[in-house]
């Protein structure tokens, strides 16, 4: 799946055609590792459930993304989530996590995308 979907056109060139590891996205082991990373790096802002209600969320200039939202899940792509993890989001409190390996960034992506599956 090397081509870019229409929803990925707004990503920087290096991310538009990024190979999405579908096996990782559907892997229970990847999601388990992603959950551990989420609790370590993301839960303070996004909340342990990923609903955007973390301990630090109230003091932020913009509310954290609610990853449990089915509407959000339908409007995003794995490349967008991976990009946000690696590069942060300009104009928001979302920091870069370039210190994560590419594999762990995909593991975290897999977990984040799974949060809206049970809504």
Task: Report the location of each language-model feature.
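Short Fe-S-cluster ligation motifs
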Residues: 73-86
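Sec-dependent bacterial lipoprotein signal peptides
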Residues: 1-3
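Sequence/structural segment immediately N-terminal to covalent heme-attachment motifs in c-type
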Residues: 27-51, 79-82
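Short cysteine/histidine-rich zinc-coordinating motifs and their immediately flanking basic loops
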Residues: 55-59
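Electrostatic cytochrome c docking/interface patches
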Residues: 8-37
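Axial heme c-ligation environment in periplasmic c-type cytochrome domains
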Residues: 5-6, 65, 84-115
